[in-house]
Amino acid sequence: MGARNKARKRAVDVLYEADLRGEDAVTLLSGRVGSPDLPPVNEYTVTLVEGVTANRQRIDELLVEHAEGWTLARMPAVDRAVLRLGLYELLWRSDDVPPAVAIDEAVELVKALSTDDSPRFVNGVLGRIAGIGDRLRSTLRGANPGAE
């Protein structure tokens, strides 16, 4: 598993734990950075957790809009964490992470961590959003110049 794959997995772990505990993911992660009892935290993990947290309201709005027939509360918590991370990479990290890679990485994460139905669900939701990704990125940049 490459460094970015590990960073994504660790970010999902933090996002998942924060979601279950009702805590802020950045605060939870900051307690782990530099901890002598835990493995070092990859810089990309920090980037992902901070990015998802900073854009979580918009990410969640997009997920609800494009997860046909699903609410966030109805989704398995792992799927929510992976979708949030995948959507962040898809829309806010597109200069660095090609859309196909963002989707594939998210699907691989849920294959390893969630239900048998999760890969198809995550692929479908992120695929629908990727189809309008250019328009969404343009809108996001207009609302937040310099964001990416």
Swiss-Prot record:
GO molecular function terms listed in the Swiss-Prot or TrEMBL record: RNA binding
Record key words, sorted: RNA-binding, Transcription, Transcription antitermination, Transcription regulation
InterPro entries xref list: NusB-like_sf, NusB_fam, NusB_RsmB_TIM44
CDD domains: Terminator_NusB
Cellular component aspect of the GO annotation: cytosol
Pfam families attached to this UniProt entry: NusB
Keyword Transcription: yes
Similarity field: Belongs to the NusB family.
Record function comment: Involved in transcription antitermination. Required for transcription of ribosomal RNA (rRNA) genes. Binds specifically to the boxA antiterminator sequence of the ribosomal RNA (rrn) operons.
Name of the protein in question: Transcription antitermination protein NusB
Organism: Saccharopolyspora erythraea (strain ATCC 11635 / DSM 40517 / JCM 4748 / NBRC 13426 / NCIMB 8594 / NRRL 2338)
Top-level taxonomy: Bacteria, Bacillati, Actinomycetota, Actinomycetes, Pseudonocardiales
